[in-house]
Amino acid sequence: MTDDLLEENVPEIPEGYTRMNWFQGFGRQIGPMYERVNADKTYTRAFLVSEAHTNGMRNCHGGMLMAFADMALGHAISLQENRYWVTVRMVTDFVEAAKVGDWVEGTGVITGQEDDIFTVTGRIWCGDRTVMSATGVFKALGVRPPRRKA
């Protein structure tokens, strides 16, 4: 079946977003993911909730939101420090559901650092609704090579 590849099924992506070049491994399973670099050099990551992301109530599955929060918050270290990172701990608060068709966005800000350990606070939202708040502790690893353009 190729109905998911037809042009009329491709969702409209908000202006300023580009599809992330993450087509292998876990990214292939949960994507596609999108990213926008804002005028103030901050970033926003996003995804469109599809049927594949839902639980039995047709809400975006909490595990999907947690995986997305991990990528959205951890990216603050990639962007600011130009380093790879791994998650040490993530605390999430689910505030409201995201439904099929919702455009989910998220970002994070580094709020603390001790040696190679960073604390990042972030928010996940749909429009004006907060879906999740999160705080993550991440360990920075080696320096990242420059990103290739897709």
Q: Which stretches of residues belong to each language-model region?
A:
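Terminal targeting signals and extreme-terminal segments of soluble enzymes
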Residues: 1-150
